[in-house]
Amino acid sequence: MLQSLAGSSCVRLVERHRSARCFGFLVLGYLLYLVFGAVVFSSVELPYEDLLRQELRKLKRRFLEEHECLSEQQLEQFLGRVLEASNYGVSVLSNASGNWNWDFTSALFFASTVLSTTGYGHTVPLSDGGKAFCIIYSVIGIPFTLLFLTAVVQRITVHVTRRPVLYFHIRWGFSKQVVAIVHAVLLGFVTVSCFFFIPAAVFSVLEDDWNFLESFYFCFISLSTIGLGDYVPGEGYNQKFRELYKIGITCYLLLGLIAMLVVLETFCELHELKKFRKMFYVKKDKDEDQVHIIEHDQLSFSSITDQAAGMKEDQKQNEPFVATQSSACMDGPANH
């Protein structure tokens, strides 16, 4: 018994060290991937930033030369105010002055981006009251949204993922793991087609300044809740049916986010991925381990109690024998 307990303890110790080692490699790999992304982005984007800075300096110098009555300080003050307004989603350009950022449809689009944590950043609250309400609204709304999405995804996953896999497994006798992998791949392909490629083609037509790559980039940035805000639909000059367009985009973002979560949940339920994820988790104490601990404690306690009981039995057995001998000795002389 003690050898089996010691052996199981050694196995648990080895598994815990292996999990810690795998977790260390995971942290190191993530940091290296983070550094790799920084190196690539810096090497690709830094030359374009430098060219843009040079172009702006030349444009500013040429403008001051053509307008000698305007000082550089006045120009910088004007540009600073324009950029500040632009950060709040207000543009001074004549072709963009007709679009309001806080009509009902735009506010509905903003609320959806806040609750989904996408947050494009092109429109932000201007007043202190709006900022305070945004904090309170988000504190309540984001957990509410997570609860809503979790419930919806769970119900959809049952009908879209689990039942089809079980049907093919039971009805046709296919391997459950193989069916799950094929189903996950097909579901991912359908989702990418319906929520990335087709909407990207639609956006490239509806948005004048967007090509297909930029439209696909917007779809990915939006449905992955990154929301950089460099591309926002419905902000063009004289956008036709802008209110209806904004409502359609809001519905697309909500449905697309649900579809993405369903696909992720489907892939996470794959046996291979579950096994891979467990490599980095802390091993839970199994019931049998707790039983072994209890049995070990009971073994130690019972051995002590057994020894004590044995000593008491010996005392009980010896006491009558001694008493009988003593009484016999006393009766002997009396009889004599």
UniProtKB/Swiss-Prot annotation:
Residue ranges of the region described as Disordered: 315-336
Localization, UniProt: Cell membrane; Recycling endosome; Synaptic cell membrane; Cytoplasmic vesicle
InterPro entries xref list: 2pore_dom_K_chnl, 2pore_dom_K_chnl_TASK, 2pore_dom_K_chnl_TWIK, 2pore_dom_K_chnl_TWIK1, K_chnl_dom
A Pfam short name: Ion_trans_2
Membrane topology value: Multi-pass membrane protein
Keywords assigned by UniProt, alphabetized: Cell membrane, Cell projection, Cytoplasmic vesicle, Disulfide bond, Endosome, Glycoprotein, Ion channel, Ion transport, Isopeptide bond, Membrane, Phosphoprotein, Potassium, Potassium channel, Potassium transport, Synapse, Transmembrane, Transmembrane helix, Transport, Ubl conjugation
Site (Part of a hydrophobic barrier that is stochastically dewetted and limits ion permeability): L146, L261
Region (Important for intracellular retention in recycling endosomes): 293-299
Role noted for this protein: Ion channel that contributes to passive transmembrane potassium transport and to the regulation of the resting membrane potential in brain astrocytes, but also in kidney and in other tissues. Forms dimeric channels through which potassium ions pass in accordance with their electrochemical gradient. The channel is selective for K(+) ions at physiological potassium concentrations and at neutral pH, but becomes permeable to Na(+) at subphysiological K(+) levels, and upon acidification of the extracellular medium.
PANTHER family named in the record: POTASSIUM CHANNEL SUBFAMILY K MEMBER 1, POTASSIUM CHANNEL, SUBFAMILY K
Record's protein name: Potassium channel subfamily K member 1
